[in-house]
């Protein structure tokens, strides 16, 4: 299942636009100011529709403004009051037709497609009201909200920081992938036991024991009855915290356990590491989930890359779905 067509009306600088997509790789080419980012953001609007903390929202500045020059030399400015974005998905599997039955519509050739229509209307006092329709427009059907969780975007913006995405200590890309493999293997207890052993060894260090003793000595002076002994340990109650401290690095040599941190690496190479991690994560997700839809959206993929690396990246992405 893939996004095969998008129709956009009155969104930012786009008065009306329809774009068709290939089921593998799509490259959007244009000069500055040709609204390439607006097209990408229109796609992101739906793919993040079911996320509780969306990183993109419609504001009053997103409504198209019509500027007309009059014969008397004056200018008339007419802001639109409604944004419409329609999405069509093709290539549905039997499982996806079942999961997205509320989205289905039949084309003239008999094949089934999934349709979604997002609408944003400007109301009084600048209030923006959003709504959606799935399936045939005339039916006015609204699919269950939970179905939007099947759509997953990975986005690298033009002013991106892929290093931060790889090094974050909360819900980072690498940690999610490792956590999924641990869940599949049922090895959470084994991983926690490794941390337990490290915990025991670390707590025997003189530096740690002295710190703990200093805390408790002060507590005795402050409160003799309420707090007596405080213990120290590595927090390992949740497996997510454990895997999120695993970070990529560049070893000095093949067998070396020491090396350069990503913050010491070039931005271009870090972009490649991030893209490789995303594609690995997407392929791994398909092992357990044959329904969800994933999209990798990259603005200015050439950023920080030497021309030869740009060619290598393009050739790789062409076959990334194989």
Residue ranges and their predicted role:
Residues 1-48, 251-322:
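Switch/communication elements of ASCE P-loop NTPase nucleotide-binding domains
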Residues 5-7, 18, 84-88, 115-117, ...:
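Beta-strand secondary-structure signal
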Residues 40-107:
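Conserved P-loop NTP-binding catalytic core
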Residues 76-80, 109-111, 122, 146-150, ...:
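Conserved catalytic network of the ASCE P-loop NTPase/AAA+ motor domain
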Residues 23, 87-91, 157-160, 234, ...:
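Flexible glycine-/small-residue-rich
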Residues 66-73, 100-104, 135-143, 217, ...:
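Short alpha-helical segments and helix-capping/turn motifs at coil-helix boundaries
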Residues 165-169, 177-298, 307, 319:
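Extended helical coiled-coil dimerization/tether regions that scaffold
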């Amino acid at each position: 299942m893939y996004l095969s067509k998008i129709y956009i009306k009155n969104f930012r600088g786009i008065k009306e636009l329809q774009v068709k997509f290939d089921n593998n790789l799509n490259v959007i080419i244009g000069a500055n100011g040709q609204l390439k980012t607006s097209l990408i953001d229109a796609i992101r609007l739906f793919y993040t529709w079911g996320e509780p903390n969306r990183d993109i929202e419609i504001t009053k500045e997103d409504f198209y403004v019509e500027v007309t020059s009059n014969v008397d030399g004056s200018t008339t400015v007419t802001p639109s009051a409604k944004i419409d974005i329609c999405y069509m998905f093709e290539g549905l599997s039997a499982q996806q037709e079942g999961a997205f039955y509320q989205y289905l519509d039949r084309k003239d050739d008999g094949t089934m497609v999934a349709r979604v229509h997002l609408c944003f209307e400007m109301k009084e006092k600048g209030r923006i009201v959003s709504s959606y329709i799935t399936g045939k427009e005339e039916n006015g059907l609204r699919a269950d909200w939970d179905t939007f969780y099947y759509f997953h975007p990975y986005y690298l913006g033009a002013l991106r920081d892929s290093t931060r995405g790889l090094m974050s200590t909360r819900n980072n890309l690498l940690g999610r992938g490792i956590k999924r493999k641990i869940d599949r293997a049922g090895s959470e207890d084994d991983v926690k036991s490794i941390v337990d052993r490290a915990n025991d060894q670390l707590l025997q260090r003189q530096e740690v024991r002295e710190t703990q003793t200093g805390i408790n000595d002060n507590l005795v002076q402050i409160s003799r009855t309420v707090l007596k002994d405080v213990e120290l340990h590595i927090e390992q109650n949740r497996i997510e915290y454990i895997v999120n401290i695993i970070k990529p690095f560049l070893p000095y040599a093949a067998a070396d356990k020491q090396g350069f941190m990503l913050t010491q690496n070039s931005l271009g190479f870090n972009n490649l590491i991030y893209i490789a991690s995303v594609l690995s994560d997407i392929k791994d997700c398909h092992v357990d989930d044959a329904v969800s839809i994933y999209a990798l959206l990259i603005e200015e993929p050439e950023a920080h890359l030497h021309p030869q690396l740009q060619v290598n990246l393009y050739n790789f992405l062409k076959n990334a779905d194989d």
